[in-house]
Amino acid sequence: MTNPIRVLHVLGGVGLGGAESRIMDLYRQMDRDEIQFDFLVHAAAVDQRKPEFYDEEIQALGGHIYVLPKFRVYNYFSYRRAVQDFFAAHREFRVVQGHMTSTAGIYLPIAKRAGVPVTVAHARNAGVVKGPKGLATKFFRRGLAKKADRCFACSTLAGEDVFGKAAMEAGEVKIIHNAIDVGRFTFDEKMRGEMRAQLGLSGYLVLGHVGRFEYQKNHPYLLDVFAAVCKERSDAALLLLGDGADRPAMEEKCKELGIADKVRFLGNRKDAERYYQAMDLFLLPSFFEGLPGVLVEAQAAGLKCIVSDTVTKEAQATDLVTYLSIEGAAEVWAQEILKQANYVRRDTAGELKAAGFDVSSQAEGYRRFYLG
């Protein structure tokens, strides 16, 4: 096919986040002579947007990145005009897939009126932040299931949160679990030894977490848990992959807890799979999640995982996951970590694939959908 059909993904940005990573996993699987992805992102100042984590790869794969002004509620009318102007100028998209559901009720109907054949609202998360921003998100999501041609959700929990239980019960929402490149994360004993030696952590109890430094991920509780572990195990270390606005505050909290020398702030990594190999246990004490891809990645790496009981059970592809409340003392998590610290790591690739979490098999379904 000389002119591939073009699919536009609408997101807040293309930094290293869960939805972004899953879309890129899918993008790499596409025959780009047949299907091309483009991205519509948001920035505070359109002409001053800084390159993000996936910019370079998107452009290398043949995709385009377009920018809208960030939605602030007070700029509702100017935001609508910007969306209208964009779709008036861009008639090339066969599918517009909105992963940023907070304003999908605005941009998807506009895209449809502009002639886009298929619009999709895709729920990628469950729960919203507290305060005015969360209230605004809930307001603009009202009736979203009726404003898109198709509705997808990464889990039942995410679907109910974004589209409502009535839409779910009516069968208006298709559940498509967040799939990963399983082979990339499969347990590798040799790589594990190399990474632990490289990090100077051979013989240590290495705990790990991957996620943006923001409210949802509950880093303060995570650090309290690790501090409790350190009281029992002087050989404990914590690897934190990710970046975000709350990182400086968490670095300061480490100093206050006396654990700064045991915590590694590693930032955004293109080789996250190597760090999973170095870990002994994976921790995810989030306040809310849709279906966390990082939990799927950790299971693919054969890691025992201790996660918040707010995380959907649909993310449990193996018997490696333990759910705990984040309402109680951090010491409860610490004791569970110590109890599970010694186990035999195994190859779980077959289990992940059997559970439908491998992107290579999921890609064919998307291909058929995009081509219509």
Residue ranges and their predicted role:
Residues N3-I5, H9-S78, F86, E172, ...:
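N-terminal strand-loop element at the rim of the active site
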Residues E20-D25, L205, H209-A228, A245-E252:
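A conserved mid-protein helix/loop that constitutes part of the nucleotide-sugar donor-binding site
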Residues V83, T186-G200:
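A short helix/loop element that forms part of the nucleotide-sugar donor recognition site in Leloir-type
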Residues G98-A104, A123:
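Short His-centered aromatic/hydrophobic patch
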Residues A148-T186:
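A short, active-site helix/loop in glycosyltransferases that binds the activated sugar's phosphate group
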Residues E251-G267:
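Nucleotide-activated donor-binding/catalytic signature segment of Leloir-type glycosyltransferases, i.e.
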Residues N268, F287:
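Aromatic "clamp/platform" in nucleotide-sugar-dependent glycosyltransferases that forms part
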